[in-house]
C-alpha cells in the first residue's frame, strides 16, 4: 500500500478558531480525518503531521523520502519566506504538492509570493479544505506517471 504524508505548518492547528472568514470553521482534526478517509478509498495510507516550528517541518521532509512516496504540504506562512523549507523540498526525490486553503494570490501582497512552489510538483490554492483532496488526486496522478 502506498504511503503519503500530509504536512501542515504554523497556525494550522488553529483551524476552526483562527480567521474563520478566511479558513472556515473546520478543524485540523476534521481535515486530517477526512483526508485519511479519502486516501483510504484510493487504497493509500496517509499520515498527518503539523508543526509550528520550521526545523520540525524540515526534519520530517528529509525523513519522508525514505518512508513515503509523496507529500502534500501546506507550509503556512513559511510559504512566503522559508528558503530552508524550499531547500528541504528541493533536496528530496519524492513529489510534493503545495496546498493553501485560501487563495494566497488574492490576499495581502506579502502573501502573493511562494518561495516553495518552484520546487514543488504543483500548487493548489483557494479551494478551502477541498484543495487538500485536489492535492491528493494530483499527487496520485503524479505517482502514476512516474
Swiss-Prot record:
Coiled coil: none
Highest taxon, organism lineage: Bacteria
Positions bound to substrate: 74, 80, 87, 101-102, 111
Keyword annotations: Amino-acid biosynthesis, Aromatic amino acid biosynthesis, Lyase
Active site per database record: 23, 100
Pathway(s) it belongs to: Metabolic intermediate biosynthesis; chorismate biosynthesis; chorismate from D-erythrose 4-phosphate and phosphoenolpyruvate: step 3/7
Top EC category: lyase
GO BP, sorted A to Z: amino acid biosynthetic process; aromatic amino acid family biosynthetic process; chorismate biosynthetic process; quinate catabolic process
Pfam families: DHquinase_II
Family label: Belongs to the type-II 3-dehydroquinase family.
Protein name as it appears in the record: 3-dehydroquinate dehydratase
Species of origin: Bacillus cereus (strain ATCC 14579 / DSM 31 / CCUG 7414 / JCM 2152 / NBRC 15305 / NCIMB 9373 / NCTC 2599 / NRRL B-3711)
